[in-house]
Amino acid sequence: MGATACGKQADTEENDTSYVAAYFALPDAVTGISRLLIKDDTAYLCCIEENGASYLASMAADGGDFQKQPIEVDDSVSLLDFAFDSTGNIWTICTDHAGSYRLNKFDESGRAVQSVALTEILEPSAISGAVRNLFLSIDAEGNICIAEKSGSTSAYLFDSSGQFLFSLHNEGNLLTTITTAEGQIGVCVGRMDYNLLTVDMKSRDWNKDTINLGTTAGLYGGTDSNFYRFDSSSLYRYSAGVQEGKHVFNWSDVGLGTSDIHLGELSDGRLMVLAASPDQTGTFSYEMAVLSQGEDERTVLSMVSLSAGPGVVQAVSDFNKTNSKYKVELTEYFPFEQNVSDEEWNNAVINLNTRIISGDMPDILDMSDLSVQVHHKKGLLEDLYPYMEKDPDIHMDDYFENVFQAISIDGKLPYITDGAGISTMLADADIISGSTGWTLPNLEEVLNTYGADSISNLSGAFFLKVMLRADDSFVDWTSGKCSFDSPAFIKLLELAGEIQNNSQNSASEELSDTYAAAYQAVLSIYHITQYRDYYHGNLEVLGLPGGNGGYHALIPEVKIGISSASQKKEGAWEFVRTLLSEEHQKSCTMLPIHKGAFETVMQAAIDGKSTWKWLYEKGKATKEDAELTKMLLSSADYVANGNQILENLVLAEAQEYFSGASSAQEAAEKMQNRVTLYINEQM
């Protein structure tokens, strides 16, 4: 057990409210949780183990006394979800190996008292053989709702005796179901933005009054508050009858995991949060945290991100959980899950740049969505090489040093990453037989020979974006000049137009038999395994087409820098250095840049225990795949530098060319003018 103070939040519901967390580990055997509910100030969990065994368990509010509940269930039956009715009975959704589904009722002692067959009630599944994604909630009157997530949402309503009444449908994608503190069943549906629907049992229809939740990554019933919403960045509480939630705390401030989150409210207002920490080498590791009001006297380190990815939030959470001297307060303009318009994004960038110009610099900057080149040129970022050299626990030989060299600008290291993907192209080796390199003319030859739609995962617009990020020859941030009207770029634009006009595939589609080559961001060994099988062992890694042959570009998982204006650089480095630890890098999503962590992650994949296994379930990663993945990571000497505003300017004019509204020359000249103006504004 551990306890860490988690400090005061800006703009919270109560400005003086702070939270402290006490942490309790769950048994290692638990690898999945489908539901957490609070009853009589005890947490009840629907647990799944790696071998497929499932059961209900309870856990006291002090984190102790984890116990399996003695309900009468055959070993062949899997529990999918559960709920309590007002008299204390337990209702569960179950399935068996034969693929039948049942709604089962147990009394408080765990004795089975009723079973309702669901197979004939549920609509036929669109995916044969797959376990159906079913959720269960019960209202204050005992009415039961079973909702299914299957692209759209189907809800099946039963009375308190288990008698089926009616069904409802909604085109939105189901996130979850809850029971609010008012005793209503809530069905959370939507796409990028979610709504909370409730059921009018009398009219047998959805209630007309819905709550627009906006960005939602999790929804949980409350006790004092009606319900809680997690948006991937912060927690909000909703009182009964209101449309707007009140901010409770930033998730990373309280040191909580960011995967598979469950939450319940105790009668005294404390919160029980169950969350998993990611780890590429195995299954989820769960931890329970009990949050209560308290004081935090640690030194605050400010950090700003336009939209912090899960890896950034998890890194901040881990630091805030374990560091006794410093606490990082992460401010985000947008939650990672939020759908943001170009106008909103541009305004946020302008706002942040205005703050920086006025001297309002945070201690730590998430550079993932900011222009590293611009901030470096203005001297706003610390060179992190001296920090690494002075740190007794960091040795350059432990890392793929080329990653730091690729990131470096003018010999200085503007940020740190923990993992990286590789932007590259792959092909059947036979299609480039006899070629001495991989250049734009080579790519054009492949397109002419095999067709402009013969490259998987590549539209013309996406090809242009990839090349803009990986090839910095068109923008010189040192001189403030660009060359989008050059013959080289016009040729690139024409090639993109050829791909765009003929492409019938996108990055979201699966491989078919028609692709001679493919673009791929290699984030895992399983990408290599998949293409090795696709090309029947005759895989050739081409790289991106360049003037001097193919090259591979790094895609940093995170980009964390220290402000040169910070008065707490020592503390800021305390946080940034955690990204380099071997233990941390086992949990990053992409390929670890620490050699020891990389080897551990590769071996886990070879043993079939990687969390990336879902990417290519029928494939088996081999030592040869690991060696090829290592070669890619260790040989990449460029870094993909994204600049969304600049990309939008270029792609807007490119679309004019793709549609035939302008020539390549005209589009390039417009790009040159617009990008030149943008660069001048940044200098």
What feature does the model see in each segment?
Residues 494-574:
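Extracytoplasmic/periplasmic substrate-binding proteins
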